[in-house]
A protein has these predicted regions:
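Short periplasmic/luminal acceptor-recognition loop of GT-C membrane glycosyltransferases, typified by
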Residues: 357, 368-405, 417, 425-437, ...
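Short acidic/glycine- and proline-prone juxtamembrane loop motifs at membrane-interface regions
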Residues: 17, 117-124, 291
């Protein structure tokens, strides 16, 4: 309960994230207009009409959340919370002897604390991937097809959240082949792939295949795809994301300690260890890039493995049946305690940073007073959509961050303001130190640019207004 409470307190004044605005906007238009589109990036790859390449199930669930609670930063940020609860339930169901330790390690894990309240799909994908693994285990134990169907559907659903979910689809199939379950592999693969095909529902409905292939070929998120030989080097990148920061490193050290403990105790490799190995190999081959957020996909498995190992060592030590190494066990106990201390520190650090920052609602309210209530077109930071998307057409500064990728003419301040004039923009809001990838003009930008004049400046923002004709 304390770990859950600590996690929930980090939602207080939680700062906005780039993805909160991006997926929040897509979900807003789906909820209000019935189509996934973007105003922030309207002139990019046809996204102003329709976004066909995105984390679709995340957007759909966020749109449903908006229908229930209304559009706000906190609505967008809490979509993953039910999947955190699902993950804890799955620990209870799978790790009966050690589920409380699993839940404690999970809710105290820095990377989980950080991304539970960010509009990203990895938390949900990890929970569904773990459900798929549990179902595969059940199928292997009793042979009932219903578990195979559930495994395939949950693995396919991870790919509806993010195309990287193909990692779970592939890992399940490879693990079944390893277990010589050939018929099961065929059924599982068919169900998983059939579920994944739902991803193309909107593409088929609008007969938008040309637009889809154009977007997937030019999207900055997919152009990092590399050759097969280069992907093999992804294996060498996995340790980097496992030790990326204080959010990932403590869990990595606990898992490595448990691996060492199992090796010293000469315990045979468990099915979970085999699945983790398969998952890592599939990830190395299929992932288009290595970012630390993707470690979340492994977290439930790392925790289940660590908790099972610690619980087994404790029970066998009590029975006197195992060959134990007291010093190693003691060091593992110390490591787990340090892990929990690190989790408390991470919670506190995040909460402190949140409280130090000016709340987004106040910041946007201040900017809204400058812009006014009359509907108009504004170029602004992505997060300006919260509290303003209902009134204004907002073009994101993030669009201009990618401007040079899609235009032959280099983006200079003069080109920027000419483009703003061409789009009928009335206000331009620049942020001095944006926390996301957004266009930032020179600090010595003149007070008059084209038809725009500087009307407001403070320690964070500069606002330009188009002069009346």
């Amino acid at each position: 309960m304390l770990a859950a409470g600590g996690l929930l307190t980090t939602l207080i004044y939680r700062r906005e994230n780039y993805d909160d605005a991006w997926f929040g906007e897509l979900a807003y238009f789906l909820a209000t207009e019935g189509v996934i589109r973007s105003g922030l990036f309207a002139d990019m790859l046809g996204w102003g009409d329709q976004v066909l390449m995105t984390h679709k199930l995340l957007v759909v669930l966020t749109a449903l959340w908006i229908k229930i609670w209304g559009f706000s930063l906190y609505t967008v940020k809490t979509v993953a919370l039910p999947f955190v609860a699902l993950q804890v339930f799955l620990f209870y169901r799978y790790c009966r002897q050690s589920w409380m330790l699993c839940a404690l390690l999970y809710l105290s894990c820095g990377v989980i604390v950080r991304y539970t309240f960010v509009s990203r799909p990895e938390i949900a994908m990890a929970a569904l991937g773990f459900l798929s693994w549990q179902s595969l285990q059940q199928f292997r134990e009793n042979g009932r097809i219903r578990w195979l169907l559930l495994a395939g559907m949950s693995a396919g659903a991870t790919a509806l959240f993010h195309l990287q979910g193909a990692v779970f689809m592939s890992a399940g199939a490879v693990w079944l082949l390893w277990a010589r379950q050939f018929r099961g592999t065929a059924i599982y693969s068919a169900v998983a792939f059939g579920t994944f095909l739902l991803y193309f529902t909107d593409v088929v409905y609008y007969d938008a295949w040309d637009a889809y292939f154009f977007q997937i070929a030019n999207d900055p998120a997919t152009t990092a795809l590399r050759s097969f030989s280069e992907k093999l080097f992804n294996l060498a990148e996995i340790p980097k994301i496992m030790l990326h920061s204080g959010g990932e490193t403590p869990l990595t050290l606990v898992m490595l300690g448990c691996l060492f403990l199992r090796w010293k105790s000469k315990l045979p490799a468990s099915d979970l260890e085999k699945y983790l190995l398969v998952l890592a190999l599939c990830f190395a081959v299929l992932a288009n890039r290595m970012v630390h957020e993707y470690l979340i996909l492994f977290v439930p498995f790392m925790i289940a493995f660590s908790a099972e190992t610690l619980d087994r060592m404790a029970s066998e030590r009590g029975s006197g049946e195992a060959v134990l190494f007291p010093k190693t066990v003691r060091w593992m106990n110390v490591l787990v305690i340090l892990y929990l201390v690190a989790g408390v520190f991470y919670d506190g650090k995040l909460l402190y940073r949140n409280l130090q920052a000016e709340p987004l609602s106040k910041r946007n309210a201040r900017l809204s007073q400058i812009v006014g209530d009359e509907p108009t077109t504004v170029i602004a930071p992505q997060s300006f959509i919260f509290g303003n998307i209902e009134r204004h057409h907002i073009i994101g500064l993030g669009y201009y961050h990618h401007y040079n990728s899609y235009h032959t003419e280099p983006l200079t301040p003069e080109v920027f303001f000419e483009d703003a004039k061409r789009k009928g923009v009335r206000f331009v809001i620049f942020e001095r130190n944006p926390i996301t990838a957004e266009y930032k003009p020179p600090e010595d930008l003149p007070e008059v640019m084209a038809d725009y004049r500087l009307i407001h400046r403070d320690e964070r923002f500069r606002v330009y207004q188009q002069a009346p004709e």
